[in-house]
Amino acid sequence: MSDIKKVVLAYSGGLDTSVILKWLQDNYDAEVVTFTADIGQGEELEPARKKALQLGIKPENIFIEDLREEFVRDFVFPMFRANTIYEGEYLLGTSIARPLIAKRQIEIARATGAQAVSHGATGKGNDQVRFELGYYALEPGIKVIAPWREWDLLSREKLLAYAEKAGIPIEMKHKQGGAPYSMDANLLHISFEGRHLEDPKAEAEADMWRWTVSPEEAPDQAEYLDIEYEHGDPVAINGKRLSPAEMLTELNRLGGKHGIGRLDLVENRYVGMKSRGCYETPGGTIMLKAHRGIESITLDREVAHLKDDLMPRYAALIYNGYWWSPERRALQVLIDHTQEKVNGWVRVKLYKGSVSVVARDSKETLFDKTIATFDDDGGAYNQADAGGFIKLNALRMRIAENARRQRG
């Protein structure tokens, strides 16, 4: 332990990471640097600075940074270029935030001369893997302190007792038993885990949802959006250009208004267990549908199918924490290359929990009306050619059937 003189802690200002801060001081006798990232969680972050100061952190060792634009531009948008979904439903809202936090922690460790980094992820979840794979990929020699795998504070009561003994300010909600759910939020989504959600037979309570109205209570009038795309990324809504963070914020607002993006999911964690979570991803749900819409007229068929084949692998890499791996980076180069001609606009309809594409157009379109028409195409397509195409593709099946008959 003596070789660790300074450690950078991913710090939220909440009970868990405040206890970790004090525990690091007590058990490692190390100078603690706190890093708090604004990635759109919607919380006031200055209280984290105040609490860190109360716990003896030097002002120059407190880092609070607005990373919302970088988060959407460099992490969310690249992921959505691949139409990424984990296990058919999950849009990876938590998974995609961890690589950015890990990256910035390592940068701060280099800048401050820290020998170690620390996080508040438990020993049961995926986040410990995501953080630490990122740390080691970006700084191979870094030391990692994961308190939940070291200490004996394995219950809420023990955490509260430690906090009280150490003089850590305790919010009233923790004294009264804590929040009903374990929640994680950023610009892409908000997640809910724990408490009665740990019983997969129990339906989520109606008052749990924060960002979306129920589809039944959504407006009776549908709303239409024209979303403009450049190189696979959304850049404007109804003619108004928006920054990446502004884009996702506005789509969240519009999607939430129409009850879009709710998900109740049992997923397979990388560490081996099944876990239930509920998610609200209104803006991401709209982006996924719209992106598929613009790709439908701008991507070559085989390129589109190749992307579909690779997507589950790409999604698993992100979910499991391999954002900074060579294979994810290689896949990203391919994905980004496919997006060069993904330009144009998509019209989507928002109505009572659903989002559907109703129109799309592009200067790069591969949709040829003269060939696709059911009317006279003026010779653009010779239907007689289809006969030879079919016979050649049927050849192997005809040979197989003839062989079967000969064998009796």
From Swiss-Prot:
It comes from the Bacteria. Disulfide bonds: none annotated. It catalyses: L-citrulline + L-aspartate + ATP = 2-(N(omega)-L-arginino)succinate + AMP + diphosphate + H(+). Pathway: Amino-acid biosynthesis; L-arginine biosynthesis; L-arginine from L-ornithine and carbamoyl phosphate: step 2/3. This is Argininosuccinate synthase. L-citrulline binds at Y90, S95, N126, R130, S182, S191, E267, Y279. CDD domains: ASS. It comes from Paraburkholderia xenovorans (strain LB400). The gene is argG. The lineage of its organism: Bacteria, Pseudomonadati, Pseudomonadota, Betaproteobacteria, Burkholderiales.
